Amino acid sequence: MRLTERDLELLRWINGHGFVTARQAANWMGTCLQTGHRRMGLLHQGGYLKRQRLFHGAERAYWLSALGQQVSGDTLSCPETISPATYRHHWMMVDLAHDLITKTKGQFTPERRLREQRAIKGVGAEGHVPDGLLEVKSKKPIAIELELTLKGRERLEGIVEGYLDRDLSAVWYFVTSDRIQRRLNSIIDGERLFKIKPWQPRS
């Protein structure tokens, strides 16, 4: 299989998120679902991608193999496996990132890339890393958080307090339930840096 520059970009995009589905790859490529499945299948057959269906009825996950990382020139290590515990949050983040890019025409950096950048700068493991950063034109970055479960109050308070010291234009919390929204509202208490946005994933 002869890889194009677009294929290499696709591999690096996949690795930034950890894994994606064929549907999500089709969205990124701006093609139909059939084309997305075909391209991902060819990359898998060529040994550049691994794939697995983690749950019955779920979309199949694709992620980079060692060969895929090598040919793409990506410095970010590819996952060995996909964790069932984080599968739902990860694939929803890919959809959310696509929605944000489509609506704002901005650039999105996923958590894995942010952690890599932090390691390169030698910052270590201090401080909370958001689920992503959205950059829109000349504005300061917007931290993106996707909350699917109700975190403990003390933990959320620590994360919110930490954001107040960062050079951000906003922190957007996307929530999937009223209960999570109420918890966050009680902690944020009107602080203008934060916005809470109800969001529902694709079925």
Segments from the language model and where they lie:
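Charged, structured surface patches that assemble and position nucleic-acid processing machinery
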Residues: 191-203
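Amphipathic coiled-coil/heptad-repeat helices and related helical stalk/stem segments
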Residues: 36, 128, 155-156
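A short, highly charged nucleic-acid-interacting micro-segment common to nuclease
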Residues: 77-93
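Active-site metal-binding core of divalent-cation-utilizing nuclease and nuclease-like domains
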Residues: 52-53, 84-88, 97, 101-143, ...
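Hydrophobic, Leu/Ile/Phe/Ala-enriched alpha-helical segments that form helix-helix packing faces
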Residues: 40, 44, 96-104, 163, ...
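Nuclease-adjacent, charged terminal/linker segments that flank catalytic cores
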Residues: 1-80
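Catalytic cores of nucleic-acid endonucleases
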Residues: 141, 148-192
